[in-house]
Amino acid sequence: MSQEIAVIGSPAFTTGFQLAGVRKVENVADDEKDDDLDAAVEAVLADEDVGIAVMHDDDLAHLSRGVRQSVEASVEPTFVTIGGGASGASGLRDQIKRAIGIDLMDDDDDASAADTEAGD
């Protein structure tokens, strides 16, 4: 069974994903996030067809503690947050590591060191 990507957030955030072909979208206006974002996230968590859920990093602050903990602990769907700035690639690396249980980038550091030594 093929799983889908879902995106949750403001219409300004979700529009690009829709243009790219994402069909599962939960739009929550910026001024309604404190009231409605929990329900949108819970709907995605309950949807068995969703394998990856995308949110803006800033939207995590609008979630209640319980829903935020569910997002952080969720393996399926795996939640990916975008736009945090400071976390960047390391944040995505941590999310992938949490989702699959291993650090895929761990060997890359060793391989690049070996390549550098081989070139000397």
From Swiss-Prot:
GO terms for biological process: proton motive force-driven plasma membrane ATP synthesis. Its main location: membrane. It is found in: Cell membrane. One of its GO terms (cellular component) is plasma membrane. Keywords: ATP synthesis, Cell membrane, Hydrogen ion transport, Ion transport, Membrane, Transport. Pfam families: ATP-synt_F. It is a peripheral membrane protein. One of its GO terms (molecular function) is ATP binding. Gene3D superfamilies: ATPase, V1 complex, subunit F. The keyword Cytoplasm does not apply. Disulfide bonds: none annotated. InterPro entries: ATPase_V1-cplx_f_g_su (IPR008218), ATPase_V1-cplx_fsu_bac/arc (IPR022944), ATPase_V1_fsu_sf (IPR036906). Component of the A-type ATP synthase that produces ATP from ADP in the presence of a proton gradient across the membrane. Has multiple subunits with at least A(3), B(3), C, D, E, F, H, I and proteolipid K(x). Belongs to the V-ATPase F subunit family. This is A-type ATP synthase subunit F. It comes from Halobacterium salinarum (strain ATCC 700922 / JCM 11081 / NRC-1) (Halobacterium halobium).
